[in-house]
Amino acid sequence: VVRTLDTLGRILTDFGNEVLYITPNEFRSVPLPSYPEIRLSLMPNRKVAKMINDFQPDAIHIATEGPIGRATRRFCKRRGYPFTTSFHTRFAEYANERWKVPTSWGYGILKDFHKDGETMMVATPGLVSELKERGFTNMKLWARGVDLEQFTPGDRSLLDKHERPVFLYVGRLAVEKSIEDFLEADLPGTKVIVGDGPQREELEAKYKDAVFTGPKYGDELTKYYQASDVFVFPSRTDTFGLVNVEALACGVPVAAYP
């Protein structure tokens, strides 16, 4: 999601637009319980209102349903400003996986959050159909793409030191990504895990035969895609999974849920 929004901002800037991101970095924040990488902003309402007033935007897009997103939504509704939203993350499934909150409750909260926007942007036609069945309305497809100058087939030698075939995962190491389903699978060759997250220490200790590289970025990340034999994406909670497209662009077959 971060990379998608960063790319969007760069493209908008290239077209002569000014872009303001309102993020938790601008506020006092606390870590989300059991998920410290996600920061929850404390009492953002007043500062959000000031930032928007000072910037005087022509368009407002709310990308998350957390405290900043809610503060922005509240500000827009009070002022009568139109805004759009996007559905990036299956928080209902995340909450069920981590805290056993019924998914129906989670989707009820999400549906209420998104209903007042001009439109809700969704990543895939399948997700549009699913959310429509759950009662969401006024959705538009917002497809994703990757930089084909960066992600392209190339030199495969980086992972030659490992027994092939090499099965690669790239992404956050967290329980909702179902990485253990991949690590438990009886597969030949080597499993390589690129990324970081709250589950990393536990997974490294439990699965000694897997190779954990930590996070990789830019050209270095591309080289891992290029050198692998199969990309594996075991998550059932992602709305899109941009890493799948990155792997395909590098000429690597993908094993994932439809």
Feature-to-residue mapping (PLM):
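Conserved donor-binding/catalytic core segment of Leloir-type glycosyltransferases
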Residues: 121, 158-192
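N-terminal subdomain of nucleotide-sugar transferases
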Residues: 1-27
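Donor nucleotide-sugar binding/catalytic pocket of nucleotide-sugar-dependent glycosyltransferases
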Residues: 107-154, 213
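Nucleotide-sugar donor phosphate/pyrophosphate-binding loop at the beta->alpha transition
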Residues: 82-84, 93-112, 122
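Nucleotide-activated donor-binding/catalytic signature segment of Leloir-type glycosyltransferases, i.e.
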Residues: 200-219
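Short alpha-helical donor nucleotide-sugar binding micro-motif in glycosyltransferases
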Residues: 215-216, 223-228
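Aromatic "clamp/platform" in nucleotide-sugar-dependent glycosyltransferases that forms part
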Residues: 236
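Short hydrophobic beta-strand element within catalytic cores of glycosyltransferases
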Residues: 253-256
